[in-house]
Amino acid sequence: MRRQIMVDTQIRPSDVTKFPVIDAFLSIPREKFVPDGKREAAYIGENFQIGQSRVILDPRTLAKLLEALDVQKDELVLDIGTGLGYSSAVISLIAEVVIAVEDDSSLASEAEEILSEIGADNVVVQLGKLEDGAPEHGPYDIIILQGGVEEIPGSILKQLKNGGR
């Protein structure tokens, strides 16, 4: 019920119309990716702080990003700075495979546990430096950076397929 309300009040009014994106948000239990003390507020339209430098993006922003990227079922996606894995979980229902890179070992471990619990078996969580990405799994159709950067590192851009986004 709360997921439906989130979609109806935050995502659809933001001109997100692609069924795979909407269906993914309806299917993934956001509350599992929110810190214990904040689970009651999991579906409000805010970012959640999950570490010193990590947030779980608010549903509207993530949905608009995925709508703009036009993720396809046969695509390989690199999700850099996955945190607890919510974005990777949502993307996993739209793309073929998601490689989720996280540099915080406790967040990476918890993400693996949650993703396994919900059956997101097409997500691989990799512990490593964010600026390195995961070149061994690329090239990628789509690369998503969770957070702001002044300049995208060349090492990341080299992992993008020709024509990728």
Name the predicted role of every residue range.
Residues 1-78, 86-90, 94, 107-121:
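Class I SAM-dependent transferase core
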Residues 70-165:
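Conserved nucleotide-cofactor-binding alpha/beta core module
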